[in-house]
């Protein structure tokens, strides 16, 4: 709660700090509450901050605030829109404004592109394809994620109200391998969804429960090689998932295809 980002050296000695931007584009009435970070090879800092919906806060390596990038597009429900047309002033003031939503988490890949995810979605926008819970941002903040798959990149395609869970997947964190396969973590049902560089779902696994490989409250995901690491916030535990033989063949096929070994890739598939 010190409203700053600290930069430390390898021995944890203080180097510098990044503090609340003093700029007309940053609401000075808001507290600066950074919660997620990504750093590029030039030392620039990209920050997700609580209550900031203009996109990622960008700092140069010297600590200077240089603006926002990657603001999400405004989405709204047509029912809410029509209701606002006929509501009284008092009723409109009580309703949520149509504003861009916040990001939950970010991950910078090996090329310097930023994968960003948000749980601020609705059933209707997920169903009609207007919501993008996962994005891939270039340095201009434009979403360049390829969506050529059969289904929208939203986790579960169908959802019900069984087992004490309801509603769609909420992608709370994301990580990406060097072969452009990325994996999103659903905090509702504890599932992991993997997609290739074209947006095709490769596999999904996981769930909530007390058995090995299941979660109580999954909150973060990362990887080491092709091993996936998932943090359980409630259990205070870290689960490590190593690829099965099936998973190894998937990664092998993708790696071979990217290396131009098309026949070998076909055999692996």
Kindly give the residue locations of the regions a language model identified.
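Eukaryotic scaffold repeat domains enriched in small/polar residues
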Residues: 1-269
């Amino acid at each position: 709660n010190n409203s700053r980002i600290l930069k430390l050296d390898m021995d944890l000695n203080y180097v510098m700090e990044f503090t609340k931007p003093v700029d007309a584009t940053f609401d000075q009435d808001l507290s600066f509450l950074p919660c997620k970070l990504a750093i590029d090879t030039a030392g620039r800092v990209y920050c997700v901050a609580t209550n900031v919906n203009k996109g990622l806060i960008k700092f140069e390596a010297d600590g200077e605030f240089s603006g926002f990038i990657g603001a999400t597009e405004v989405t709204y429900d047509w029912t809410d829109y029509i209701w606002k047309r006929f509501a009284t002033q008092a009723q409109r003031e009580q309703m949520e404004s149509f504003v861009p939503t916040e990001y939950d988490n970010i991950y910078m890949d090996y090329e310097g592109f930023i994968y960003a995810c948000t749980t601020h979605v609705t059933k209707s926008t997920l169903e009609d394809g207007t919501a993008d819970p996962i994005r891939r941002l270039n340095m201009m903040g434009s979403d360049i994620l390829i969506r050529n798959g059969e289904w929208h990149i939203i986790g579960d395609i169908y959802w019900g109200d069984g087992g004490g869970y309801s509603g769609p997947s909420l992608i709370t964190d994301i990580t990406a391998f060097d072969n452009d396969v990325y994996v999103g973590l659903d905090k509702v049902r504890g599932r992991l969804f993997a997609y290739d560089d074209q947006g095709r779902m490769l596999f999904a696994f996981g769930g909530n429960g007390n058995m090995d490989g299941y979660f109580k409250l999954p909150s973060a995901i990362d990887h080491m090689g092709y091993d996936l690491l998932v943090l359980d916030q409630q259990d205070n535990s870290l689960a490590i998932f190593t690829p099965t033989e099936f998973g190894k063949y998937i990664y092998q096929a993708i790696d071979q295809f990217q290396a131009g070994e098309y026949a070998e890739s076909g055999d692996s598939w």
